[in-house]
């Protein structure tokens, strides 16, 4: 069963209604896409509270000591996090790292929480995914932002003590298009009756508390819409039907979960009816920071392996690090790790200060981190050669260091899909980047807008662009010697300022050229966003290097900016010189079967099963596979 097909217009309306329409705080990322390098929003470099840092350092020391006792290879081999590891994490308060101390949690800042995830994930990435899904999108964060005091007192102490939570939105036939959500929550006396099936619920087999998104039918006294609930996993009618298995993250407890006539008390409603997607997206503004924390750990691991191996491995009379083909890979890994760490630290501290709107910045670091970590790990595997492709267990059996290079590559792959795929992140960020334009000129390109609305929008747009466009012609980045406070990195900051204005001009040209069709130019929008990510990363790297005053940091920031500028310039060129239109036309012919002969010569794909499984409402017909700690 799945909900009837939802039209493009309705899907867009649902997505638009879910986003935060207002910008109550300034945003460095928003200004960057408008051609304004607002360094005052990130400079001077934020400083974490010394007392909070001291407490966090003490905790991180304990967490490190525990992490050193974990057998990461056992988790990979058994595809299971041992009970004693879960109990140990609970004993350390790891399930309550972000929960306020008054509810029994540790109250770590975003900065130190992400450092904890980076650390524990280095023992095995499944551990980082467990804690991230639990705290960043599971019950704690939505309740922190939207929950009532009664809900916080009821649920947060349980979680802080070690109960696991999960977030359930995706369904067998519903992924990035939530307008088609099929799960329903029918109002009944005292609450709601929940029915539906949820797919890919990370922590689902372990969780005792669930955040569930479901459609509330519109009726008298009920505004309806996608709504968020806290659901007790032990409630009658909840069945964990299957634990899913994946390419990587083999310790992940990910489930298919069925709800059949599950009673959810009224007091378990989070926020208001119809507010579910807004809650999910708002939660992800800071929740997304946990994913690049895992990516940063992979970058650090890749750098450590590349450095030590390439110094020890001798080929043609020299360490392989001395050969240019390998040296360039090492330099890329080192520079990118520095850039990613700078972005993540900056975003975390901005979130902790709570003076800026970081929805664009957090999305950019998620996008950049997931893409670049994959490339860094791939280069590390290449540096290792055949040993990079060999499993850690096989290496150890031959008496060599058990380096899980191939595992890291497998574990990382999901990050380009988790919490918004790269393609969806491009569109999400692009929508926020052009918000200023749509707020003044959106009605001009809206086919359903009346003539009166279009006329008023034209007047607004004329006034806005008369002020804005002249600011894109000249800027501080064209003044020799500007940004001198950045020392040898000043030239990179001048580039960021110039490129920011160029980026804004290119975006404006595209809007003028394609108008309402711009949303379909996904290749163009993706490149615009990727350029913005590079400029944000350069700003963060230079700001960090300047603040820390470490010569090694300045060297790494310079190296990163040199590489980032090349990538940005390639994308600027590709904005208008590309094969996008040809590719779209070719893809249409491929799908129509014109080139099906290319598929000959191999065995056919399996004929059994559906591409997307169907489901029927009703009680579960399979055994519950819920995992309970012994």
How does the language model describe each region?
Residues 1-134, 143-153, 157, 161, ...:
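Flavin-dependent oxidoreductase catalytic core characteristic
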Residues 132-139, 170-173:
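Short, glycine/charge-rich beta-strand/loop segments that flank catalytic centers
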Residues 155, 170, 180-181, 197-199, ...:
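Short beta-alpha junctions and helix-cap segments that line functional grooves
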Residues 161-169:
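A short, Trp-centered hydrophobic/proline-enriched beta-strand micro-motif
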Residues 173-176, 200-203, 220, 246-253:
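Short Gly/Pro-enriched turn/cap motifs at secondary-structure boundaries
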Residues 195-239:
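A short core secondary-structure module
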Residues 237-246, 251, 255-257:
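Glycine-rich active-site loop/lid that clamps phosphate-bearing ligands
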